[in-house]
Amino acid sequence: MAIANKNIIFVAGLGGIGLDTSREIVKSGPKNLVILDRIDNPAAIAELKAINPKVTITFYPYDVTVSVAESTKLLKVIFDKLKTVDLLINGAGILDDYQIERTIAVNFAGTVNTTTAIMAFWDKRKGGPGGVIANICSVTGFNAIYQVPVYSASKAAALSFTNSLAKLAPITGVTAYSINPGITKTTLVHKFNSWLDVEPRVAELLLEHPTQTTLQCAQNFVKAIEANKNGAIWKLDLGRLDAIEWTKHWDSGI
C-alpha cells in the first residue's frame, strides 16, 4: 500500500513507537492522519503538521477500553468527515503486570473492540469497501517474557486474533497483519512491574541485551505498511524487518 493520499486512523499514534511511526507516515504523504489517543499532546501534533503541511492531521481523545458502541460512535464521526478510511492501526499497549485487568483490556480487548467497531463501515457483507488493519502486537506473542506472563499472554491473544482476521478477509473484505516489535527503547521498558514481583529487575535485565530505537522500529513499520501483505506476521527486531512463518501444530479442518 502506497501511503501517499491515503486516509489512516492510528490508535495510540502519540506513544513511543507510535509517535516515531506517525512521523514516518507523515513524511510519506497521506491525505489524512487521524490520531486517536488517551492523552492529547498538542506539541507532538504541531510537530507532525510541520513535518508535512500538506497532510491533514486530526486528533480525537480515545480510550480503547470503552465499549464497541462508543468506539463506533467515534468512528462514525471520522467516517462522516473523511468518507473513506484505508488503514486502521491498533497500537495501544501497556506493560505492567500489576494491572492484570487493564493489561488485558488495553492490549487485547481494546484491539478487538476497535476492530469490531470499524467493521460496521468496512465489512463487504454490509456493502462496505473493505480495508486494512495493522495490529501492533509483540515478539512476546511468539515466546513470552515469562516474568510478565499477563502482558505476554495479552499480546499472544492479539496476535492470534490478527491471524484470524487475515483468514476472514475473503468474507469481510478486510485484510490484516501484525507488527511485532522486539525490545525497543521506550519509556515502556525502562521500568515496569513483573507479575507478583517474581523479578523486580526484569526491565534492567532486558536492557542489558541488544535493543533497537523507536526510529528503527518506525521505519520498518512503514515498510510493512507498504508491503501490505495479508496475514503477514512481521518481526521488527534489532533494526530488521522479517516475515515470520507460523508453525502449525493443529488445524480445525473447517
From Swiss-Prot:
Substrate binds at residue 138. It catalyses: a primary alcohol + NAD(+) = an aldehyde + NADH + H(+); a secondary alcohol + NAD(+) = a ketone + NADH + H(+). PROSITE patterns: ADH_SHORT. The active site is at 151 (proton acceptor). InterPro entries: ADH_Drosophila-type, NAD(P)-bd_dom_sf, Sc_DH/Rdtase_CS, SDR_fam. It is an enzyme of class 1 (oxidoreductase). GO terms for cellular component: cytoplasm. One of its GO terms (biological process) is alcohol metabolic process. One of its GO terms (molecular function) is alcohol dehydrogenase (NAD+) activity. Its EC number is 1.1.1.1. The keyword NAD applies. NAD(+) binds at residues 10-33. Gene3D superfamilies: NAD(P)-binding Rossmann-like Domain. Keywords: NAD, Oxidoreductase. Homodimer. Belongs to the short-chain dehydrogenases/reductases (SDR) family. PANTHER family: 15-HYDROXYPROSTAGLANDIN DEHYDROGENASE [NAD(+)], ALCOHOL DEHYDROGENASE-RELATED. This is Alcohol dehydrogenase 2.
